[in-house]
C-alpha cells in the first residue's frame, strides 16, 4: 500500500485555506509516492579510480621502487636467517624413536611466514631537523634556496596533516595479519587420527585417544570448525555482469552494495518515485539500514540482482524485494545532496494530547510506517530529523516494535489543527451585525494549552499536541498530593472521605481559608484559617489560592501553602477540586497526581444513585455524561489516570492501588517540573 508523499512541505497550489498554511490538499495528485521496503545493512561502496597528474605518478613510481628494494633486502636477510637456523636445528635433532606418524611430518615445502619487517616512522620534527642539518652543510646559493623551499613546505599545515596520514597508513599496512585457520574440518582430521590409533596398544596412544574423546575437546573442535568455516568463506565475487552494466550509466559515480537479506529482520527504508527513478526516501530508526550507516536518503536504485529498477513503480519494487532473500546486490547512484553529519540525537519522551490514526491521515508519507496512538500515551521520540514527521516508539511496545513509527511533528500538527479550525469557522454561517461577537465566541471555544504565567491570556494560546515528560520518583518524605476530579454524583467525594476515615495517619486534607467569623467549637488552623476579607483578596491577587469562591457573602478557598503544609508533615494531601482549578495547581511546585473519576454507563449510573436513595431524572443523567465528555476534552491533558466508578468498593481498591504505586514506581511528569 502506498500513500501520497506530502511530507508536510509547502505546495505551490492548494485549496483555499490550505495554501497559506503550507499544507497540500488531500485531493491533489501526489508529487511522490513513498513505500516501505526491506533494506538490510552490511553495505559497502566501490568508487571509481582517481586520476593522477604526471608529476604525482612519477613520485608514486619512485616510492614503489624504493618499497620493492626494501622488500627484496628484507626477504634476502630473512632467507639467510632461516637457512642458518635450519642448519643449526638439523644438527641438534636426535634420531626418531617411537611411532612413525606420517600425518604429523612437517612438509618440506611449507615455510612459515615471518612478521613484516619493521618500518621506521619519521615524524615531522625529524624531517625538519634533518633539513636544518643539511642547510648548515651545504654552502652554495642554489642548494640554500632549495632547502628553504623544503623547510617552508614542511612547516605548511596541510603538508603536516598529509604526512601524519601517510604515517598512519604505513603503520596499518605493516601490521601483521590476524591468524587465519589452515583447515575447517579438524573433526574429520581427529577421526583419521583415532583410526590410526585403534591398533596401537602403547600407553601414549591410548592416552591420546582418551584425550581426543573428552567432551571438552570435542566441543572445542566443533567450535573451531564453526569459526573456521565462517572465516574461510570467500566473499562472493561480484558478477562481471554488474561491472558491465555500470558502463551503461555514463560518467555517473556508481556504488555497489551487497546485502544479506533475512526474512525476519526488518531493513527500515522507504523508496519513492521521481520521474523514472526510484529514490531511497527515508531511513527508519531501528532497521539494519540505519545501523549500517551506509545507505542514505537520496540514493537512486539502479539495479537489484541484475534487474533494472529505473522505470519501475514503487509497488513493483516492493513486490520484487518481498520475494528476494539471501545475498542481494544493489547498484546505486549516491545522493548528490551534501548533508552535515547527523548530530547524535537524544531521545525525548512526550505525552500525546490528541488521538492519531495513520490510516485516516492523507498526509502521512508512508502509511505502513505510521504509528497510531491515543490521547495520554507516552511516546519515545528518537528522531526529529524530519521536523514534520518524527520517528518514535510507543511506551511499552519497544520490544514488539522493531522499527520506529512515523508520528506528526509538533509544528506540523499545530499547523494542521489550525487549518482545520479555520476551515470549520469559515463554514459556519456568520449572522449580519454579529460578526465580531461570533468570532470572539469561536476563539474561546478553541482547545488551548495556556501559558503557565498568564492563566487568562488568550493571545498566548497553543494548540494541544505533545508535552515533554520525564520520569519522577516521589521522595519518601514528600508525597505528591492526590487530586480527585469528576462531575457531580460520580463518587469522588465519597472515595476521598473513605480514604480519610480508614487511614487517618496517612492521609490529610488541606485546611481551607475563610473570611467568616470563627464559631465556638472551631479551632483556628485545624478547621479553618480565619483571615480578613482584605487579606483574602490580596492573596487571590497574588495567585496563592488553588480555588476559591463566595458563599453567603463569605469567601472560602484552598491555598497552595495549605497543601504544602500537609506535604511537609509527611502525609498525603487529598483534594477534590473543580476542573477550573487544575491549571493553577499544575503550574505550582506541588507536583499533583490527578485522577479523573468517570461515571459508568447511564443505566449503571442510575442504579448506583438509586442505592444512595437518589432518583435522578433522565435529563440529569444525560447532563452528567455530557459534563464528563466536556471535562475530558477540555482538561484531559491534565489527568494522570482515570477510574470508571461502576462499583464504589472496586473503585476504592483501584484508587488505593494507584496511590501505593507512587511509592514503588517512577511516574511520568512534565519535564518543566524537574528543571
Swiss-Prot record:
According to the record, the residues making up region (Disordered) are 1-32, 52-79
Record domain SH3: where:
345-417
Source species of the chain = Rattus norvegicus
Cited Gene3D superfamilies? 2.30.42.10, L27 domain, P-loop containing nucleotide triphosphate hydrolases, SH3 Domains
Name of the coding gene: Pals1
Q: Which residues form the L27 domain?
A: 120-177, 179-235
Q: Tell me where in this chain the PDZ domain is found.
A: 256-336
Give the binding site residues for ATP.
Answer: 486-493
Q: Which GO terms describe its biological process?
A: central nervous system neuron development; cerebral cortex development; establishment or maintenance of epithelial cell apical/basal polarity; establishment or maintenance of polarity of embryonic epithelium; gene expression; generation of neurons; morphogenesis of an epithelial sheet; myelin assembly
Region Interaction with PARD6B, as annotated, extends over: 21-140
Q: What is this protein called?
A: Protein PALS1
State one molecular function term (GO). identical protein binding
User: How does the protein associate with the membrane?
Assistant: Peripheral membrane protein
